[in-house]
UniProtKB/Swiss-Prot annotation:
Region described as Disordered: spans on this chain: 58-88, 113-141, 263-321
Entry annotated with the keyword Cell membrane: yes
Biological role: During the asexual blood stage, involved in the sialic acid-independent (SAID) merozoite invasion of host erythrocytes by binding to host SLC4A1/Band 3 protein on the surface of the host erythrocyte.
Descriptive protein name: Merozoite surface protein 9
Topological type in the membrane: Peripheral membrane protein
Annotated localization: Cell membrane; Parasitophorous vacuole lumen; Secreted
Species per Swiss-Prot/TrEMBL record: Plasmodium falciparum (isolate FC27 / Papua New Guinea)
Taxonomic lineage of the native organism: Eukaryota, Sar, Alveolata, Apicomplexa, Aconoidasida
Self-association and partners: Forms a complex composed of MSP1, MSP6, MSP7, MSP9 and MSP3; within the complex, MSP6 and MSP9 mediate the binding to the host erythrocyte. Interacts with MSP1 subunits p19 and p42; the interaction is direct. Interacts with host SLC4A1/Band 3 protein (via the 5ABC region). MSP1 subunits p19 or p42, and MSP9 form a co-ligand complex that interacts with host SLC4A1/Band 3 protein.
Statement: the UniProt record of this protein carries the keyword NADP: no
Keywords: Cell membrane, Malaria, Membrane, Secreted
Family according to the record: Belongs to the plasmodium ABRA family.
Length: 321
C-alpha cells in the first residue's frame, strides 16, 4: 500500500507484488526485528552484569565529575611490558569488547546488509583462516550443540569468519543465566588473548569468578521480603528486558496476524470479482435461454393459429357445398 501510494503521488505506474513476494518480505522484516531485539537484550544483560561485578563507588563518581572532558582515559590494562593483566581488567575488557561488537553488528545490520564482509573496529589484524582455533574443529558447523560447554577464548585478532561463529556460541550461553544457573554464565565471558600455557590459570580464575557470581545471585534472591517468587526477582534485577521482549513478541504476533488477515482479505477481494463475473455470465445465459424459449413458444402459437385458421376455412368451404 505504501509503494502504491508513493507511485500515485509521483504519477508512476503502480508496482505489482504477488502474495508470495509480500509474505517473503514480511518474513525478512520479522527476522530483522528479532535479531535487533536479541542484540538489545544481550547488551542490556551485559551492562547489568558489569555493574554487578564492578559497582561504581561514590568517590569514583565524584572524581569523574571534577575531571575535564579532554583528560585522556586511563588504560584498563597495565602498560608495563611483560606484566599480566589482572582478572578484573580482563573481564571488564571482555564485556566491553562484546558490547562493542554488538554495537558494530547492530549498526551494520541497519546500514549494510553485507555485514559478514565488513571488518569490525576491534579487529586490528587478521589471522590465517586455516589456523586451529581453541575449542573449535571442523565439525563445529554440523554439530554446534556439542560445543555448548566448551571454553571459548575470544580473540579480537580472530578471522572474521571465526569471530562470527564465536559470537553465535556466546549468545547461546545466555540461556543458562535466564534459567537461573549462574555458575554456567561465566562461560560467556571471554578472557582476552591467552596462550595454552595460561589455560590452568584461566581455569582457576573461572572458579573464583563463579563464586563471585554465585554470591551476587544469592544476594539477588534475598533482595525482597519473599513476597515475590525467584523467577520474578531474577527478572527484575537482571532480565528486565524479558517483559519488553514478551510484549514485543506479542505485538509482532498481532502484526503478523493483522498482515495475514490483510492478505486473506486481499485474496478474498479478488475472489468476489470472479464470482460476480460468473453470475453475470449465468444471468446472460439464462436470459438467452428465456428468449429462445419465448421465440419457440411464439412460433408454436403461430403454427397453431395458422392450423386453426386453415381448419376453419376448410369447414366453411364444406358448409357452402
Amino acid at each position: 500500500h505504501y509503494k502504491k501510494r508513493k507511485a500515485q503521488e509521483k504519477g508512476l505506474p503502480e508496482p505489482t507484488v504477488t502474495n508470495e513476494e509480500y509474505v517473503e518480505e514480511l518474513k525478512k522484516g520479522i527476522l530483522d526485528m528479532g535479531i535487533k531485539l536479541l542484540f538489545s537484550k544481550v547488551k542490556s544483560l551485559l551492562k547489568k552484569l558489569k555493574n554487578k561485578i564492578f559497582p561504581k563507588k561514590k568517590e569514583d563518581n565524584q572524581a569523574v565529575d571534577t575531571k575535564s572532558m579532554e583528560e585522556p582515559k586511563v588504560k584498563a590494562q597495565p602498560a608495563l611490558r611483560g606484566v599480566e593483566p589482572t582478572e578484573d581488567s580482563n573481564i571488564m575488557n571482555s564485556i566491553n569488547n562484546v558490547m562493542d561488537e554488538i554495537d558494530f553488528f547492530e549498526k551494520e545490520l541497519i546500514e549494510n546488509n553485507n555485514t559478514p564482509n565488513v571488518v569490525p573496529p576491534t579487529q586490528s589484524k587478521k589471522k590465517n583462516k586455516n589456523e586451529t582455533v581453541s575449542g573449535m574443529d571442523e565439525n563445529f558447523d554440523n554439530h554446534p550443540e556439542n560445543y555448548f560447554k566448551e571454553e571459548y577464548y575470544y580473540d579480537e585478532n580472530d578471522d572474521m569468519e571465526v569471530k562470527v561463529k564465536k559470537i553465535g556460541v556466546t549468545l547461546k550461553k545466555f540461556e543458562p543465566l535466564k534459567n537461573g544457573n549462574v555458575s554456567e554464565t561465566i562461560k560467556l565471558i571471554h578472557l582476552g588473548n591467552k596462550d595454552k600455557k595460561h589455560i590452568e590459570a584461566i581455569n582457576n580464575d573461572i572458579q573464583i569468578i563463579k563464586q563471585e557470581l554465585q554470591a551476587i545471585y544469592n544476594e539477588l534472591m534475598n533482595y525482597t521480603n519473599g513476597n515475590k517468587n525467584i523467577q520474578q526477582i531474577f527478572q527484575q534485577n537482571i532480565l528486565e528486558n524479558d517483559v519488553l521482549n514478551q510484549e514485543t513478541e506479542e505485538e509482532m504476533e498481532k502484526q503478523v496476524e493483522a498482515i495475514t488477515k490483510q492478505i486473506e482479505a486481499e485474496v478474498d477481494a479478488l475472489a468476489p470479482k470472479n464470482k460476480e463475473e460468473e453470475e453475470k455470465e449465468k444471468e446472460k445465459e439464462k436470459e438467452k435461454e428465456e428468449k429462445e424459449k419465448e421465440e419457440k413458444e411464439k412460433e408454436k402459437e403461430e403454427k397453431e393459429k395458422e392450423e386453426k385458421e386453415k381448419e376453419e376455412k376448410e369447414e366453411k368451404e364444406e358448409e357452402k357445398k
